[in-house]
């Protein structure tokens, strides 16, 4: 299947600028005339929903303060410092905070300026599934995918705060889009681009970004048009290498800076960003040993200390199991998405059972993503 470049009709030479702007609303020649206007309308409605009342939005004060400090000093910006003096970092990688800090540097410290990046990220995320799904099943299905994502409650909620999940979702959806393009052509550059997107997502949410890797790799190995399995495995290995390099680039750079010239790394007893990411924000989240050792504690940690125990799924009565997302407080928040994903995957399999090629990768991709997320949710004591 050949991918046709998406180019809108070029305006006539010498046309006024306002007419050139209007061409952005016109669909490319290979799509129905209603496709792009409908997509932009969906994204606009989503942006309004995400940004409504953002001047009085509820934000995380700890990370809001860090973004403000980072906006006032390039030194603090580089290292993700929590305080203006640059003595201690935040307890996570600062990828999402970089975007927020730039917004605050441009517009000044306002709640709406802190939330604005998440609104933009959420609106941009709506555009990407359309392109990925359209390649496989056409523009109508792409619009349905964009609309479903736009009205998903958790998507709206994430776009109305200052948590890092909005950037994580945008980058992972871009990775899935690049992978879908690679599936159709066997393009190594597209697969490497997917690795770059996942690596950047790691800067926003650390190991959670890697949960998508098994699904993306399995989809390419099973459905890419490369003639030999050895070739596909080599492509996946190269993409994995790119992911690792991009993921670990900032951590390595910080580790090379002498400790006296940078802030102390919060979340680590040994001033190591690797300990912060892979222990405090990794293994420690599974074992319950994840109390910050340097920076100011979050309200959740204060409550944990006062009660004498951490607020984990296990201590709240939610036992580890493969169906944990379908029970308790998780069911109302996100559990309903899993049956919908499985039903959608089965529907694709039934509808496309006679069609060979990349469109049949939808089932392993969906199931792989669901399996990765379920394995995380089934951990013995992962925190809420």
Model-derived segments and spans:
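Membrane-integral, polyisoprenol-dependent glycosyltransferases
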Residues: 1-299, 303-384
């Amino acid at each position: 299947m050949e991918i046709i470049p998406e180019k809108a009709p070029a305006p006539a030479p010498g046309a006024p600028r306002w007419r050139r702007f209007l061409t952005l609303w016109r669909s490319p020649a290979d799509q129905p005339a209603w496709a792009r206007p409908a997509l932009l309308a969906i994204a606009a409605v989503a942006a309004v929903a995400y940004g409504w009342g953002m001047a009085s939005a509820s934000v995380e004060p700890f990370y809001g303060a860090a973004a403000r400090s980072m906006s006032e000093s390039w030194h603090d910006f580089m290292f993700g410092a929590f305080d203006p003096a640059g003595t201690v970092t935040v307890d996570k990688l600062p990828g999402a905070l970089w975007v927020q800090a730039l917004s605050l540097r441009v517009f000044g410290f306002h709640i709406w300026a802190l939330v604005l990046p998440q609104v933009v990220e959420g609106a941009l995320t709506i555009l990407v599934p359309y392109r990925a799904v359209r390649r496989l099943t056409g523009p109508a299905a792409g619009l349905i995918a964009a609309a479903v994502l736009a009205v998903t409650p958790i998507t709206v909620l994430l776009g109305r705060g200052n948590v890092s999940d909005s950037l994580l979702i945008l980058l992972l959806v871009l990775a899935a889009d690049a992978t879908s393009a690679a599936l159709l052509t066997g393009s190594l550059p597209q697969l490497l681009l997917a690795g770059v997107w996942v690596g950047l997502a790691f800067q926003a949410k650390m190991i959670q970004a890697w949960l998508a890797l098994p699904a993306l790799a399995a989809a390419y190995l099973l459905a890419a048009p490369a003639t030999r399995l050895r070739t596909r495995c080599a492509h996946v290995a190269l993409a994995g290498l790119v992911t690792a390099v991009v993921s670990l680039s900032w951590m390595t750079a910080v580790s090379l800076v002498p400790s006296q010239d940078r802030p102390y790394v919060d979340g680590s007893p040994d001033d190591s960003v690797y300990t912060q990411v892979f222990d405090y924000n990794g293994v420690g989240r599974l074992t319950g040993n994840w109390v910050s050792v340097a920076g100011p504690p979050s309200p959740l940690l204060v409550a944990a200390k006062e009660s004498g125990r951490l607020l984990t799924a296990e201590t709240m009565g939610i036992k580890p199991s493969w169906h944990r997302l379908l029970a308790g407080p998780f069911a109302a928040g996100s559990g309903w998405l899993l049956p919908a994903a499985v039903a959608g995957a089965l529907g694709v399999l039934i509808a496309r059972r006679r069609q060979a090629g990349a469109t049949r990768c939808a089932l392993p991709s969906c199931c792989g993503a669901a399996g990765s997320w379920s394995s995380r949710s089934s951990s013995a004591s992962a925190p809420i």
